[in-house]
Amino acid sequence: MRAVLTVGHGDRSQLRLRTDYPDPTPGPDEVIVRVAATAVNYHDIFTRRGMPGIKIPLPVVVGSDLAGEIAALGSGVTGWAIGDRVLVDPVLRDGKRFGMIGEVQDGGRAELCAVPASQLIRVPTEVSLDDAAALPLAYGTAYRMLIDRGRVVAGEKVLVLGASGGVGVACVQLAKLLGAEVVACASSTGKIERLKALSADHTVDYTAAKFVDAVRELFGKPRISGGGGVDVVVNFTGGDTWVDSQKCLRLGGRILTCGATAGFNLTTDARYLWTYEQEMIGSNGWTETGLVALLELIAAGRLAPSIDKILPLEETAEAERLLEDREVFGKVLLRP
């Protein structure tokens, strides 16, 4: 079969297209999924670059987000049939291994993928396999961060940094569905216009203005007595954006984070932390319940995942370049 392997740590030259990669066979309690689409995520790029303290067996077919149809059933599999449309939950939950599909075992950048049947989620007929493939790492993460961990409710003011990437766009869409007033930050006029089309209430081009100044102009400077600022800042950027995020929060506000793409060594101003009684809430990954809820939102016509481009498997390196050069709005998919 055709597959793209990450053969070593380094730049995009470590990606190899194979046309003779062995077809997988299902083990006990496994199925073979004929991959319709797989999403490209920064996790794939981090896997290729190498992550300190995390050993990845190489070569490996990455691609954690994938959806398709069941092509074969292993022994012991019940409740599923060949041809069933499925989304794969990438986090291995069978108790046998720790890690993710596309990390500790081959993933979706191939025509076929072997996965434990316990990882399967049925895709409603109203949902395209492309939309399903866009969900786990971006929309699943955003759902858990905003709803399960962040407790965002209607009427709250939510500032989203890095709002044009996969997780950021998902946060804007879900916060709007929750009834929040959303301020979305991005780095170009084109991305700002697309965020407006997603119904972001306010937008900030942070190459032209500081987001903390924009927030204070919109809602006023936070006051110890209450008022001003936003209720929630979604910040998975990290780096030097952390203290400015604190400066945006109203009394009792909270920062939600699921990562730190600009750097893990954060500077926190403890004065804002105690004076404004701020919360800093971490969120890690997603749940199967959240993925099912997202599929139901799509089926009901309430959510449409933002898919920027769909490229053939042969253009995997270009897909990763688009992410690395920040030329993507939402998600990029590969078609094996």
Language-model features: where?
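C-terminal hydrophobic helical "lid"/dimerization subdomain
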Residues: 1, 288-336
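Mid-domain Rossmann-like dinucleotide-binding core that forms the NAD(H)/NADP(H) cofactor-binding site
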Residues: 85, 130-208
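Glycine-rich phosphate-binding loop and adjacent beta-alpha segment
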Residues: 178, 186, 236-306, 336
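N-terminal Rossmann-like NAD(P) cofactor-binding module of classical short-chain dehydrogenase/reductase
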Residues: 87, 233-234
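Residue-level marker of beta-strand positions
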Residues: 65, 84-85, 112, 157, ...
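Short amphipathic alpha-helix with an adjacent loop that forms part of the alpha/beta core around
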Residues: 211-227
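Glycine-rich beta-strand-centered segment in the early N-terminal region that forms part
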Residues: 22-38, 51-92, 124-126
